[in-house]
Design a protein with these regions (language model features):
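NTP/phosphate- and nucleic-acid-binding module
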Residues: 1-153
Length: 153
């Protein structure tokens, strides 16, 4: 109603408390690259002069290496037929004929291929191949069909 307020009508008080408040920001960040790096780092093995990635079979880049012992005497043709048969059966196979068989095994081990199949002269005679398992380096002589069946499991 027309009253005027002056300084006597007002009261100003400054209050300070001893509690400090720090703002928090949580930004969890991870991507596939970090997960993949951890997977590869934990799977890397070194034994004497041999180095390999010990990935589980279902995460390895290829299921099978098909390698002829040499590229003559029809071994490469037989290996290419087996390679095609493996692909027809849904096996993710890799064909390699460069260098010695030991070097091919080493390359396959380094990229994590679980099984390696060697086609040699005995393959031409009786239809068997040498199947090698990556981690144990165990080798067995089996028929092509049994080898492909074992790889598919």
């Amino acid at each position: 109603d027309g009253k005027i307020l002056n300084e006597n009508h007002m009261n100003q008080k400054t209050v300070r408390k001893g509690e400090m408040v720090y703002p928090n920001v949580v930004e969890p960040s991870f991507g596939l690259d970090r997960i993949l790096y951890c997977l590869l780092e934990s799977s890397w093995n070194v034994e004497d002069e041999r180095e390999w990635i010990s990935l589980p079979q279902d995460t390895s880049p290829y299921d099978l290496l098909v390698a002829p012992l040499m590229t003559k005497d029809g071994l490469d043709d037989s290996a290419k037929e087996i390679f095609a048969k493996a692909q027809e059966q849904g096996i993710d196979a890799y064909y390699d004929e460069a260098g010695s068989i030991g070097r091919r095994y080493a390359r396959a081990d380094e990229i994590g291929i679980f099984f390696s199949m060697t086609v040699d002269h005995q393959t031409l005679e009786d239809g068997t191949v040498t199947l090698r398992e990556r981690d144990s380096k165990d080798q067995s002589r089996v028929s092509v069909e049994d080898a492909l069946s074992k790889v598919r499991r």
